[in-house]
Amino acid sequence: MAYFPFYIDIENKNILVVGGGTVALRKIEKLSPFKPSITVVSPKICEEILKFNVKAVEREFDDNDLNGVFCVISATDNEQVNSHIFELCKEKNILVNTVDDKEKCGFIFPALVQKNSVTVGITTSGKSPIYAKYLKEQFLNMLENTNSDTAETLWQYREYIKKNTADEELRKKVFSALMSMCLCGESIDVDVVNKIIKENS
């Protein structure tokens, strides 16, 4: 099965994590930087999870826990509970990730690389996590060795360039030249942008 890489705004979205151990912790660590509203349901929740901004509910899973949730992470060590949650989510059209059970996943977690405004998600569709990890390290190394302000600078002058260029072909040339300067660590201001526009017109 191939997975389409949607990038979704999950800020303040209600995400339910069922399970309170290290597996659940790893998922919460990945989700937290994107500021969702996370509820953790488990009879026992590890201390590391409680350090995150989560709502902790220390009891067994209840079917009503699914009310109003955007997606579910099923991370218990009980296969019967995981299967029950998966079937309920399928009935209610709720996205569910059953940890370590690809057949019971409506979505999967990619290996994530984050650097300033750049987010890269890498997946082998669940076939080889170790290869995904290797690729993650390669991308991270590449980003570490480029100007970290490139995306922000291009965004800063995006509207200005669109307003001051006559056509799409010219815009592409200007953005390409600007990006090359950013990657070389050169200082950018309006005068520099105007010069690039003039040189490519």
Language model: regions and residue ranges:
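Hydrophobic, well-ordered beta-alpha structural blocks that scaffold small-molecule cofactor pockets
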Residues: 1-44, 49-51
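Structural motif
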Residues: 14, 70-71
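Residue-level detector of alpha-helix initiation sites
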Residues: 21-23, 80, 126
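Hydrophobic beta-strand scaffold residues
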Residues: 38, 56, 95-96
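ADP-ribose/adenylate-binding Rossmann-like module
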Residues: 71-75, 82-108
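An accessory alpha-helical subdomain
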Residues: 126-201
